[in-house]
Amino acid sequence: RSDALKFLCQYYLNKGDYSKTITYAEIMKNVADKTKNPLLQLYSYIYQAQAQMMSGREKIAKKNLNLSLELATKLNNDSTLCSVYGSLGLYSANIETDYYRAIRWLYKGIQLAQQNNFQQQYALLLGNLANIYYLKKDTAGIKYALECYELGHSMRNPYIIYSGAVNSAYMYFLMKQNEEAMKYIHEAETLMLENDFYDQAHTYNLFGNILYDMGEYAQALEYYKKAMKDKQAAQTSSIVYAHLGYARILMQQNKQPEAILLLKQGIAISYARVNAIHRNELYENLSTCYEQLHQYHDALKYYKIFRLENDSLFNKDKERDLSEMRFKYDSERQENLIKQSKLDV
């Protein structure tokens, strides 16, 4: 029974049906209490926390994350500890927009997964890590995305291949290598449609971004519209990002008043669903719109908010810590590869 409950929680979580995930996680908690099963209790905390976090219920999500961290540490269960570290990383990124803390949690999970040879968790954490690097606009994330992609293929795991492909595509887009990005995004789209993966807006946004870069505004617009249609079955950050993409095209077409409405809509969604990812860019473009309309008072007002949001995201001291962590990851990975090749010989 407990395996069936775990399967259902994971299934609905992957589909983005958070209320069903929470329902089954609560049933799991009741079963765990009755049968005095602490491991099952731990899983119920993890699933509840992930679903609550993704549906913008940040306070209760944090409480369940803390409970899972405490219990996983007490039970000395490395596999669930990897999941908890991963979830804490996503919480830091989505709710607190603290990308540095997010990366620290993800590195912790990656190290633990590496030590225990948890290949699947290791690959998924790499995909999440690459995504945070994209949000930081830092191309150093390419190696994590490609490693996730290669592991997905060697494990023949469609979801991990998809995660690796979509994150590699975002990275190549950041590096202005659009042809390479297109190669990976097409593979991601095929897998996403074959398996009906959740958050398809994330993939459509990148198609939109690449086409926008190429000056193909009409085609780009179609993809942003597709992404915005996905409201119920997409992550908040993807929906917000689609608003940003759509607004940038309207700005190109000198339709600033319409762009302003879309940007304000995106900001409203990001506050309503408690997810600050991309909010800084919405404010930046809002300021630009008002500037283009010669409404300098509003332009300045939104520019100040943009600066506040932006300054809290990027920090020189934290960048230094980050490069040290990256160096550590690289050297540990080298050691593991050397060990592995000695075993293979």
Give the location of each predicted region.
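Coil residues (strongly favoring Ser/Thr
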Residues: 4, 18, 34, 78-79, ...
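Hydrophobic positions within repeat-based interaction scaffolds
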Residues: 2, 7, 22, 139, ...
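TPR-repeat structural position
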Residues: 18, 38, 58, 78, ...
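Amphipathic alpha-helical segments of tetratricopeptide repeats
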Residues: 26-33, 66-76, 107-117, 146-156, ...
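Inter-repeat boundary and helix-capping residues of tandem alpha-helical solenoids
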Residues: 35-39, 75-79, 98-99, 116-119, ...
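Conserved alpha-helical positions within TPR/SEL1-like repeat arrays
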Residues: 3-14, 40-54, 79-95, 106, ...
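Structural motif corresponding to the intra-repeat A-B loop/turn of tetratricopeptide repeats
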Residues: 15, 35, 55, 75, ...
